[in-house]
Amino acid sequence: MPSAIASTDEMEALVRCAAAHDRVVETNPDDEFAWLYEVAARTGCAITWTALVTYPDGNAARTHWTAKRRTHREGWAAGARVYPQVTCRPLSVQLSLLNPTPFIGAPAFKELMALATADRPSLYRDTAWRARARDELASERFHQVRWSSILVAETTEAELLGRDLASLATEMQLDPFDALVEIALRDDLTTRCTMIVGNDNAEGVTELLSEPGCLLGISDAGAHVGMLCDAGMPVEFLALWVRDRGVMSLERAVHRLTGEPAAFFGLHKRGTVTEGAHADLVVLDLAHLTPSPLRRVYDLPAGGDRLVADQVVGIDHVLVNGRPRAERGGRVLRTV
């Protein structure tokens, strides 16, 4: 991707173009984000970056979230229109050993991914390759691999569903990676696990959800459809964090989901219930509001699969400009 290798000067030139047309810039800068606050101050452009989330303590590959928050607060106090995105959801992806994308940074897995899928089981059975892969995953680069936070999500062995690999490895008297490989080989690598990589520190997430100058977001927005699905974030936020944990008032939470992003992205007359605005409304039963579980469907071309969260309980009606809409009645909103 050109944006991954662009210099800061090139990025600033692009930001100036966006600012000239009253547009917004989104970027995923990993740990190199402090310069965004300087660019925003120089150009007057609104910028949002992903992601301000918690990671486990001791992760040498990541700047601690409190340090990132401190940089944000300093830039925000100086007047920079920079809005990091936060979320209530754990950062998780689906891991399959047939296509182990979360491990692709390890050289052993680059070697594996170069093979045809039919040839990959034999490499997993190669003890020398497996030892190399195991050592690479245990290195500092992959310090975020927490085997206790990798849960079996799809398997032909029903008794393993929901179990974490750390405890399974103990029972099997194996290294966690070896345990994962053995389980996956038993069902021809169709096993899938949910791999939680961060943002599961409840205390830290609570603080970030109320942090000034942040946007609720970090949705996958349809990318990586077979690995993750964050469509349930608004429902989880209202049900689990507002209703159950009381992190903020319902009124404040609704504004966080509606008015704040609408104002940031320039969606005029949207996001608030005011005279003259579009009557975009969601009628929900807060007492019974329940997030949808994820499920896998195979409705893409050539039988491709994706994850969906379409079984929410407690959403009674959706109105767009005052009119009830069907489930698939939406369209993209643009600034004017």
Which sequence ranges carry the predicted segments?
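Glycine-rich tight-turn/loop motif centered on a GG-T
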Residues: M1-A6, R23-T27, I47-A51, C193-T194, ...
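Hydrophobic, small-residue-rich alpha-helical packing segments that form membrane-like cores
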Residues: M1-V39
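Short beta-alpha connecting loops at secondary-structure transitions
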Residues: T50-G58, A223, R243, R296-L307
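C-terminal cap of metal-dependent C-N hydrolases
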Residues: E207-C214, A231-M233, V282-R328
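Polyanionic/metal-chelating signatures
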Residues: A18-A19, F33, V39-S219, D230
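Alpha-helix capping and helix-loop boundary segments enriched in small/acidic/polar residues
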Residues: P2-D9, T27-N28, N59-T63, V225-C229, ...
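C-terminal helical cap
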Residues: L160-E171, P176-T206, F237-L289
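Intein/HINT protein-splicing elements and their conserved insertion hotspots or analogous self-processing inserts
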Residues: A326-V336
